[in-house]
A protein has these predicted regions:
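Peptidoglycan-targeting cell-wall enzymes and recognition modules
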Residues: 19-109
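Cell-wall polysaccharide-cleaving catalytic domain and substrate-binding groove, primarily
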Residues: 1-61, 119-148
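Non-transmembrane alpha-helical segments in soluble domains
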Residues: 12-15, 72, 76, 114, ...
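Extracytoplasmic mature domains of secreted/periplasmic and thylakoid-lumen proteins
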Residues: 91-93, 99-122, 128-137
Length: 148
């Protein structure tokens, strides 16, 4: 998919946080603990959740699914087809994180990549983003897998 190691680590740090996972443990079958709306390692919600379930079904799967390959495939599909977006709540992160997908793919800073992914793909409210935890997970992933 052409992502730098730093951008990939930023994605992993976000997925670790979103799925309630810990190092070496991204939970593919995670369900949001508050209201059950978000599902999967990305915590797809609302319309995105409906589309994700349709994607699973079109590939012979149903929810819950532990098929990490399908979840990654769908996440990358979303990123390439309109879900890499700067919306109102993204602005709290700061304008410097409003990067194109191509710029993100080439990112060389783990912390920047983590914040950019959170702002443009996860799109959680800044005050609830837990960026310290996301960034710690991303830095852990980068240190563990760098140049492997």
């Amino acid at each position: 998919a052409g992502y730098s190691e730093q951008a990939t680590a930023g994605i992993i740090g976000n997925l670790m946080f979103e799925s309630g996972g810990y190092p070496d443990d991204i939970k593919t079958n995670a369900v949001e603990y508050k209201n059950g709306e978000g599902i999967g390692m990305v915590q797809w919600s609302y319309v995105r959740k409906t589309r994700f379930r349709q994607y699973l079904k079109s590939h012979g799967e149903s929810w819950p699914s532990h098929n990490i390959s399908l979840q990654i495939s769908y996440m990358l599909h979303e990123m390439e087809h309109g879900e890499w977006a700067w919306i109102g709540i993204s602005q709290k992160y700061g304008a410097k994180y409003d990067v194109t997908l191509q710029e993100f793919k080439q990112c060389r800073d783990v912390a920047f990549a983590t914040r950019a992914f959170c702002a443009k793909f996860e799109r959680c409210h800044y005050k609830d983003a837990h960026l310290k935890e996301r960034t710690a997970g991303a830095k852990w992933a980068y240190q563990k897998y760098h140049s492997q």
